């Protein structure tokens, strides 16, 4: 089913899908991580609950692989995520007076270097999130751990998902030519 307006740009389509997910009850970080997950399929050291979170959501929608650096805001949180390939620049500075500057380039604002508490670069598959209500930067790992424990994703996968190799084999019935013609005539 198509959930986006025709003749829209990729960015506009992304916005519409993110809004759809958010308006139907998911938090904005949850919605964005559904759309731009980190590279989880071959990450053997990933915690199982986080892997289950990504695996479950992969059954609902295909990842939007970039190259993309996407910023978002819901009025309470502002953040950015870099796709799993990491081909877009995404840098941030945090000042001693708790301002956050996020941009694709360094030097977009004239900031005295002595006022910079720390600098960073958003890494592939990682989310940079500022909680405006709490006045803090949310750790990527803590955010994803919290989201991955909101529902029993692993149980749902084990209970409901089947691999094609596990399905029973059947013989293919080939109808006779005349019966196909009769069925076709009945539906005309």
What are these regions (language model features)?
Residues 3-185:
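Conserved short alpha-helical segments that host acidic/polar catalytic motifs at enzyme active sites
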């Amino acid at each position: 089913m198509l959930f986006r307006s025709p003749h829209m740009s990729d960015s506009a389509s992304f916005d519409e899908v993110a809004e759809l997910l958010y308006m139907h009850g998911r938090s904005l970080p949850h919605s964005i991580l559904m759309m731009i997950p980190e590279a989880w399929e071959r990450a053997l050291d990933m915690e199982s609950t986080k892997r289950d979170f990504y695996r479950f959501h992969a059954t609902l929608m295909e990842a939007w692989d970039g190259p993309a650096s996407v910023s978002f805001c819901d009025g309470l949180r502002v953040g950015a995520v870099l796709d799993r390939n990491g081909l877009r620049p995404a840098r941030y500075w945090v000042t001693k007076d708790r301002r956050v500057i996020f941009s694709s380039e360094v030097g977009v604002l004239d900031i005295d270097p002595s006022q910079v508490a720390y600098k960073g670069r958003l890494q592939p598959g990682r989310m940079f999130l500022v909680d405006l209500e709490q006045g803090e930067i949310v750790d990527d790992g803590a955010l994803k751990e919290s989201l991955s424990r909101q529902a029993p994703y692993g149980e749902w996968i084990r209970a409901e998902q089947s691999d094609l190799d596990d399905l029973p084999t059947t013989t293919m019935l080939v109808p006779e030519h005349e019966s196909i013609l009769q069925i076709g005539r009945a539906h005309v």
